[in-house]
Amino acid sequence: MEPISHLVKSSLPNYLSSLPVPDSIGGWFKLSFKDWLALIPPTVVVAGIGYTAYLAYCPAARASCSAKISGRCNNQIRKNEPKVVDMIDVEDIAEKAAFCRCWKTKNWPYCDGSHGEHNKQTGDNVGPIVIKK
């Protein structure tokens, strides 16, 4: 506990008081390159804390982030089966058929273009598998 106490009561205040923070707006333009380098670490820490708070408390950021890191791809199609397998005879295909690979289609197993919205939300680049005769 003593190291934490020393950090909070002595080291951190000494570090912060030694930072070259100017008293006026004009003082920012007079900082040297070395002064600017000294201001980078606390700026990165403050930005990191702000970004973490943004992800924690902003619903839009949370939804976007969780969509990108979600490991499951099938969220709705035949969830009662242990493995979804569809057999399609090549003779049944007229000229060509596009099959879904993103699991977002409402017309399973055929692609209806739902991957476009999925790609926008997740940054993915999935598309259909197209079979030609």
From Swiss-Prot:
It is found in: Endoplasmic reticulum membrane. It comes from the Eukaryota. GO terms for cellular component: endoplasmic reticulum membrane; mitochondrial outer membrane. It is a single-pass membrane protein. Gene3D superfamilies: CDGSH iron-sulfur domain, mitoNEET-type (3.40.5.90). The keyword Transmembrane helix applies. Keywords: 2Fe-2S, Endoplasmic reticulum, Iron, Iron-sulfur, Membrane, Metal-binding, Transmembrane, Transmembrane helix. Its cofactor is [2Fe-2S] cluster. Signal peptide: none annotated. GO terms for molecular function: 2 iron, 2 sulfur cluster binding; metal ion binding. Binds 1 [2Fe-2S] cluster. It holds the Pfam family zf-CDGSH. The chain crosses the membrane at residues 36-58. Residues 1-35 are lumenal. GO terms for biological process: intracellular iron ion homeostasis; mitochondrial transport; regulation of autophagy. InterPro entries: CISD1/2 (IPR045131), FeS-contain_CDGSH-typ (IPR018967), FeS-contain_mitoNEET_N (IPR019610), MitoNEET_CISD (IPR042216). [2Fe-2S] cluster binds at residues 100, 102, 111, 115. Residues 59-133 are cytoplasmic. Belongs to the CISD protein family. CISD2 subfamily. This is CDGSH iron-sulfur domain-containing protein 2 homolog.
